[in-house]
Amino acid sequence: MPIVMARDLEETASSSEDEEVISQEDHPCIMWTGGCRRIPVLVFHADAILTKDNNIRVIGERYHLSYKIVRTDSRLVRSILTAHGFHEVHPSSTDYNLMWTGSHLKPFLLRTLSEAQKVNHFPRSYELTRKDRLYKNIIRMQHTHGFKAFHILPQTFLLPAEYAEFCNSYSKDRGPWIVKPVASSRGRGVYLINNPNQISLEENILVSRYINNPLLIDDFKFDVRLYVLVTSYDPLVIYLYEEGLARFATVRYDQGAKNIRNQFMHLTNYSVNKKSGDYVSCDDPEVEDYGNKWSMSAMLRYLKQEGRDTTALMAHVEDLIIKTIISAELAIATACKTFVPHRSSCFELYGFDVLIDSTLKPWLLEVNLSPSLACDAPLDLKIKASMISDMFTVVGFVCQDPAQRASTRPIYPTFESSRRNPFQKPQRCRPLSASDAEMKNLVGSAREKGPGKLGGSVLGLSMEEIKVLRRVKEENDRRGGFIRIFPTSETWEIYGSYLEHKTSMNYMLATRLFQDRGNPRRSLLTGRTRMTADGAPELKIESLNSKAKLHAALYERKLLSLEVRKRRRRSSRLRAMRPKYPVITQPAEMNVKTETESEEEEEVALDNEEEEQEASQEESAGFLRENQAKYTPSLTALVENTPKEHSMKVREWNNKGGHCCKLETQELEPKFNLVQILQDNGNLSKVQARIAFSAYLQHVQIRLMKDSGGQTFSASWAAKEDEQMELVVRFLKRASNNLQHSLRMVLPSRRLALLERRRILAHQLGDFIIVYNKETEQMAEKKSKKKVEEEEEDGVNMENFQEFIRQASEAELEEVLTFYTQKNKSASVFLGTHSKSSKNNNSYSDSGAKGDHPETIMEEVKIKPPKQQQTTEIHSDKLSRFTTSAEKEAKLVYSNSSSTPFSGPTATLQKIPNTHLSSVTTSDLSPGPGHHSSLSQIPSAIPSMPHQPTVLLNTVSASASPCLHTGTQNIPNPAGLPRCRSGSHTIGPFSSFQSAAHIYSQKLSRPSSAKAAGSCYLNKHHSGIAKTQKEGEDASSYSKRYNQSMVTAELQRLAEKQAARQYSPSSHINLLTQQVTNLNLATGIINRSSASTPPTLRPIISPSGPTWSTQSDPQAPENHSSPPGSRSLQTGVFAWEGEVENNVYSKATGVVPQHKYHPTAGSYQLHFALQQLEQQKLQSRQLLDQSRARHQAIFGSQTLPNSNLWTMNNGAGCRISSATASGQKPTTLPQKVVPPPSSCASLVPKPPPNHKQVLRRATSQRASKGSSAEGQLNGLQSSLNPAAFVPITSSTDPAHTKI
């Protein structure tokens, strides 16, 4: 594109200059300022860092723009400046346009600044950024204007000076307090206390009351980082960027005093939480509500969906920011007047950290001098790059070579100065030359009457005031994503009296800026009086006007990604390169004009330019008001259509014969503004809404039918096109189901070329539009026949509406549809909710497409699904931050034994509906004779159904061949008992043996945060069992006293805690949850053990291997001394433990037991167990030796009764012989609970001091179980190493266990 700097500057003819001005005006990086728009100011584009565009770099290179970075290293700032043609100079150089520093500036450096040079700090900014100075300033404002008016900080004390006051306050309220150093950042030196004795008084610190009721999202604490730009302190001008960051802690919030030292729970600083192992980062810049860092807009949209008033919240946040800066305004403005030679030399970007409590009241935590610009995640780059680019644009870098400031500029322009910059008015030495030039420009444009113009308002103003007024208005025109929160017509009335720096600039700016708004002073003053009378700093709802709602809509909108910005700028650039219409290529005689004509044309052109900017801003704001509710469609256009003003210009040119003034004046005539009508309580009828939606779809179809144009076929372009077409496919799939007429959808295959797919998709969309329009016509006919008058009353004028539809662009239709959907709280009017029954069963897999991207062609209209599909949809908005993309599913393992018949009823396994899965599938298994089932693994989330035992089988195979299925299974109980919905439930009495063998071969690893709770639960459970057995009760009475509901509640709590950690799943945590589930099974079977088993059943260990059989011990009468219930329970427990030991031993040594059923060599559990046992061989040997020595030292002198005898069978396993009385009835063997591997050490039960019970050692104190062959043999012979020990009681003997 031709630019003025690339041409030969020797040609100084007037025609050449005019052409150069025209070319320069079209450049995307130039915005013209000054009275006659003669001073070029550089416009920054955030997407420039993605590509090396010479068209953007050429401006900075032509003017030799430069920067230097001192005492900091900001890669983002360096990248943006370099991409716009700046070059970096040495830190000691004085020829620069920008000095970016990380510390405060010395006064002598500020005095040497020229008018074109800028620095990123004001003098004495530490009045805000040092915590002690900020506290002092806020306290001073509280004393002056009242405590409640400036109650924006928690109760704070400065130690050691105010230590006595702090102790006095602590004695009244002993809540937690937070200690912060007065001059630190990134969470360094911050800790919590609950006693004054814990504070070190060696240095100055700040102690603030800890806000113990923060607003939580998914039970996690968070704060908000806000970016505040101040361009001037005299007059005070404050901007707030529309996007920020919500930073989450990595540990769920708990008010308990035991967690007071957990910084990952109470501190939200990124520098602190990134060190946590639970920190989650998001790699997709379009996903803003996942991980430990959200965008502020995503947080606000979430709160709005939860029913919170985000408009009032952001009004309170603006109130907090303005009051904070006003508290330090006097000191900083005084320093600027003393040290800074030019008002525009300094600007400052502050980082405000705000915490929101449960009542939606924002609290100021701190103000950062140089907020972090590090981009550790794509979301950081998107937000911070856009913010920095918009900030540089607002500040306004004049395109001027910094080397020019060394020479004294002449009073009048010379040839050399005009050659270096022909578009900038020559300036004298400061300060008179700039004022003279501005005054001349202002006098020449005194006839301007449009809104926002200076017009006749310059009368009575000094030169400096005129210059300040012009600069503030131009800054606001270039604000981009920044929102000016002070001064505005509302905030000036509320906070103007708080200003302490008494100068005329603030008053002049307020009166001149807002004089065309009528007289809102009375209503605003009434609102302020009401607020003052109430004594509360909160803004009343009545005073929240339309501007506050507009600001809230801007804060809630999603920020465009850099890729979308790049494509939009490229499309606008292509439009600018098209041939100009006759309006531009005027006859040569039009260049010869008087000065008055030129000024009049310039006024009209400026009016048109400002109106176009205002219309664009209003359109953007209206588009971003879209509601993020469940059924609101997100309609975002990727490519803006060519403006229709060109066709209007052509028609006017042909009719008027070249009178440009009349042409452009006629374009100012107001047109039918449908959005404004909707905002003014107007509404569309249902037919009109469908007509508008059909017109929007037609625009999308036309865009699909267009060629790719000059677009280069790259991988990124193809991916974006594919993604956008996928969204149209998803829309057609869902929308076609709601049509009353049948429509056959033949969607293109993904194997086709992109252009072919676009053509087919456009054809299908056209067929859909035809059917859709027919249904709309039928609806209109029904309405006319029924003569429903309210439709005509609700709808707008039909003629104007049809004219609007004919002329509206895609963006305008999108804005109307978005606002209409937000206003009516539903999108069902576009497609309805009617769906034929034949289509209800259609389910489309949409998991492959991404949603909610601002650059997509269109978003699918979300229709309320049928009832039968409501449970299958994914609703993960609230939990999306902590859920991973892949879900762990349970594995169903069943074994086959052909020798043993199965006479019980078949078990049907059905899949439990899972909210994390996109659909529900039912898996029905009907095992034949000899089949039984067991779940080898369980999901991380366990339902809280009580666990019931199943009927014991006579003989069950000991090994299983794995068969994998997905999902968690529901197992109907053959005995008619309630279903057990836990994944660890087993069919068959000993099917948990396989899980036990699998668990014994693994190493347990739990997070430190979960150890305490798990240990406490297990210890409490076993101590409760021992206490019950101590009282000599039998099994049935013990089960009656045992409160199973408490175990169920604890199990549910543990399951919820583990489910919250699904983003960092661990198979070891699942194993622990399985053991707690089995524990519930074991306790629930006791009270049914005597009645559920035939008297002939008594399982013991056979000499030949792990085969369960029923057998009587001939030595039973000799050793009989136990009650029937205790004896039976004891026998079953030891038999089960022996089976586990035997199987683990056989797997570790490789000696296969002689049994008619041999496990397959490819068994998953066998290979996994052998692998894990081999890895733990050396460690387990040492742990076994230590455990054996410890227990032998403790129990060496003890003598145990000979009630049970354990004998070893050579290499084949262990045999347990139990003695029972001849008249004793055997009981059912319960489901044995297998503890975690870390608790399966060689353990000898410790005899109680009173010889009435056998205590079980705490799980956390037991060493890891050995897996080697030697460890198994030695452990079973000398240490009595069962898998888990169940206490046995007797009313006569102190113990019944014999080694």
From Swiss-Prot:
User: MF terms per GO, please?
Assistant: ATP binding; metal ion binding; protein-glutamic acid ligase activity, elongating; protein-glutamic acid ligase activity, initiating; tubulin binding; tubulin-glutamic acid ligase activity
| Subcellular location per the Swiss-Prot or TrEMBL entry | Cell projection, Cilium; Cytoplasm, Cytoskeleton, Cilium basal body; Nucleus; Cytoplasm
Q: What is its EC number?
A: 6.3.2.-
Superkingdom classification of source: Eukaryota
Summarize where Mg(2+) 2 binds, as residue positions: E366, N368
| GO BP, sorted A to Z | microtubule cytoskeleton organization; protein modification process
Give the binding site residues for L-glutamate. Answer: R247, Y270, S271, K293, K384
Against InterPro entries, the record matches this protein to:
TTL/TTLL_fam (IPR004344)
Q: What is one GO cellular-component annotation here?
A: nucleus
Q: Where is the composition biased (Low complexity)?
A: 838-847
User: Would the keyword DNA-binding turn up in this protein's UniProt record?
Assistant: no
UniProt lists compositionally biased (Acidic residues) regions at 597-617
Alphabetical keyword list: ATP-binding, Cell projection, Cilium, Cytoplasm, Cytoskeleton, Ligase, Magnesium, Metal-binding, Microtubule, Nucleotide-binding, Nucleus, Transcription
* Binding sites annotated in the UniProt record for ATP: K180, R186, G187, S208, R209, Y210, I211, K221, F222, D223, T268, N269
Primary location group:
other
Quaternary assembly: Interacts with the transcriptional coactivators NCOA1/SRC-1 and NCOA2/TIF2.
Family to which the UniProt record says this protein belongs = Belongs to the tubulin--tyrosine ligase family.
Instruction: Give the protein's biological function.
Output: Polyglutamylase which modifies tubulin, generating polyglutamate side chains on the gamma-carboxyl group of specific glutamate residues within the C-terminal tail of tubulin. Preferentially mediates ATP-dependent initiation step of the polyglutamylation reaction over the elongation step. Preferentially modifies the alpha-tubulin tail over a beta-tail. Required for CCSAP localization to both polyglutamylated spindle and cilia microtubules.
Protein name (Swiss-Prot/TrEMBL): Tubulin polyglutamylase TTLL5
- Origin organism is Pongo abelii
